[in-house]
Amino acid sequence: MYIYSNTSAGLLFVKTEAAVSEYRILDSRGKPVCCPKLACVQEKDGWLTTLDARALEFWSVDSPVLYTLEANGESQRFGHMSLRSFQNKQVLLNDTHVYLLGYIRGIVAHDHPNMTGLSDYEAARKNILQAKKYGFNLVRFHSTIPSEDFLRAADELGLLVHMEIGFAYEYDDQGHKKNLSMNNDMWEKSILQYRNHPSMAVFCIGNEMHNSGHYPQVHALYEQGRALAPNKLILDNSGWGEYDRSSADIFCQHIAYFFPYAHHGNMFNVDDPWKFNGSAYDVELETETGIGAANVTAVREATPIRPTLSHEAMHYIDIPDYDALNAKFDAFAAKVGDDYLRRNGIKKPRYLTELPKLIARKGLTADMPDFRRASRSWKLMATKVFLEKLRLSHLCGYEMLQFSDCLKYENKNGIVDFFDDDKGIDAAWLRQMNSDLVLLADMEVPYCYVGDKLHVELYASDFLPKPEIMGTLTVKLDGEAIYTGEKFVLAGGLQRLVKLDMRMQTAGNHTLEAEFVSDGITVRNDWKLWVYPEAVCRTKPQLNIGDGALKDWLSHGSQESDLWITDTLDEKLLETLEAGKTAVLLYEHAAQRNTWQFQGALERFKPCIWDRGSNLGGVIRSKATADAVGGELFDLNMQPLLEAGSKVNLDEFPVKTAEHVLGCDKPVRDRMKGLINGVKDFIDQDTLRRFSHLFSVKIGDGQLIVCTFNLSRPEVPVTANFLQLLVDHTDVLKAESGMSVEAFRAWLEKTNAEGIRKEDVMNHFWEIDNKPVEDTLFWEEAQVNLAQMKSTEG
């Protein structure tokens, strides 16, 4: 028996092998519901009975109403619901647009076993209730078919489910992809088995199939899926595919591993991700022609023809408390016993024992509270930016890696831990960006000088089941109302509400708040603002720098000084220190002008994505520096200083330094070291490196202050205020300990003779920041043959 609905027409369809004569529909209390029979016709594969469903309530995420149909000796639970896409604009649940707020489970790298000590059904309920508490309405099972227990819980609690049957590529002798290998029987069997679940929303063939619209067998499976489950969405693959293919009802596209801020702030509104697979019809997207009057380049827009989800969104990790996790795991293991652990495939992962050893070995124990605090703040900042930028775009939702931390691997990119317990992220805070109705602020930058204007545009992203509501919008600055607008009528979807021009009068950190109140509905959101005083240096230092704009800005001081500022690590710098002077080194990693290099890396203003990257935020320990830049933890105000800057790795620095600004590295292995070289240990040189963006050390009788920030835009408020501190107040940055000039030179010579380490493969992709996602050219340049390895990540 198969039951599906046409909710707009108020009809219920029942497909059976034999004609339906007597039947009844019962609600959850066992009470009969009147649904008169309208028709019963024979089809080639059975009988189709049409019932009047106007007495039935819809099944939805917010109201998961379930019924039972009894007919022909069978009993089938169902929900009266429909799901379809409309053009390339909307996904419609019960004929009302819905914004899909998804998270990912499934393969071992993105999931965890049953860590409840209870049944699988109870574990599913816990996971779903937690996800809904944080605002999610969809779960994708990556390359996995979920259990009946999970789908039963999803039916009852109201969560949409995206399942994947899985596929593989066949390879030739050279390791090149040849054909698709798909389990067609499993595709049909899975749809037939699960299509009656109202929670079952998306039947998908598999993960990251390139050029799916070019395969006839994919089109055949799509058509079969449409026929077998007309009230579900059929998706050929998650991640790739042509923008104009007809083999899917919804697209789920790999947007980018960029961070949607500043120069990548428009990443959700450009067509670059669609150019990887291009057109299903092999049309050229860029052409050049020449005629007598002009040479013409035409670039065709790759506009997706279906509503689109952001594939494997965010992926942002932070640093957990390993001592607390170990204690929690051990207590759980003792409680449930060995038999339960064995039945559920639960083993204590290596990182829970190896990373605490590494932390102790590297002398980082005292720093870990700061690192955890900084990485959590950084992750929350990045999550907020990503979700709000996404909601300001044309996309219809996302699927996030991930809601629950993975047990097996060390990449902690979840909102809750691998027990599905809260880990300190406030659910109400996340729902400000992760609900049917959210308020958004669009601004170019969140900082300015005193007396300058900040232009802010406030939006509503409204995907309520009944979106047309009237309410009052109140905007506050630091708790004081600056705007109140009554009788705002929301029309549904993305809607600009008001434009604000705020001439900021007071320096310091501020909070902009917005609240929309309607009958029974209140939504809020808030945003940090930084307002800086004008900054002019009194000191006129001695300069040896090549950046013209910075050199000009630093040349306007009125007080001559022997402070030496250079952008080159060379013998001249050592001579200056030997003379007992204070020198500021504006260090650029791997710059050819340097005689020597420090161990270190390039910096980007973006979070670590799984095992890509080396920035988990930072801690500003110098109070004077924190006051100058506007906070003790890295935040949006630090973007001009961090982006395209550098950082020095102090792990092997020969003496203790005064560390004023610390950068947090990730506690995660590079997967390619394991896949290519078979190295799967946690390596001290690669893990939780002691990065610094600002530190001081005595060299001989001189003071060396090393700064790795990007100072190429001194007109930016945070940069100007930091420069004023750096130049006028070097005394607050002085170090007490150090080494001789001779010892420093010898250490530099030894370090450089041994070799400056390059970033691992995945970190290198993160730091070059020039492509949305790793492409064939990148892997070739990195000398990685993907056909010969099996990754742990999807």
Regions found by a protein language model. Give the residues of each.
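A glycine-rich, often tryptophan-bearing local segment used as a flexible ligand/cofactor-contacting loop or short
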Residues: 568-655, 716
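Short, solvent-exposed loop/turn segments at secondary-structure junctions
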Residues: 108, 241, 257-258, 314-317, ...
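Substrate-binding/catalytic cleft of secreted carbohydrate-active enzymes
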Residues: 125-129, 138-417
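Extracellular ligand-binding/catalytic regions of CAZymes and related secreted enzymes
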Residues: 410-414, 419-421, 448-459, 464, ...
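Short, Gly/Ser/Thr-enriched beta-strand-loop segments that form substrate-interacting elements
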Residues: 654-691
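Secreted/periplasmic carbohydrate-active enzymes, especially glycoside hydrolases
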Residues: 1-142, 153, 157-161, 201-202, ...
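Short acidic, Pro/Gly- and aromatic-enriched capping/linker segments at domain boundaries
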Residues: 76-90, 291-296, 398, 568-572, ...
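Short, well-ordered secondary-structure micro-motifs within conserved domains or adaptor modules
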Residues: 242-265, 555-595
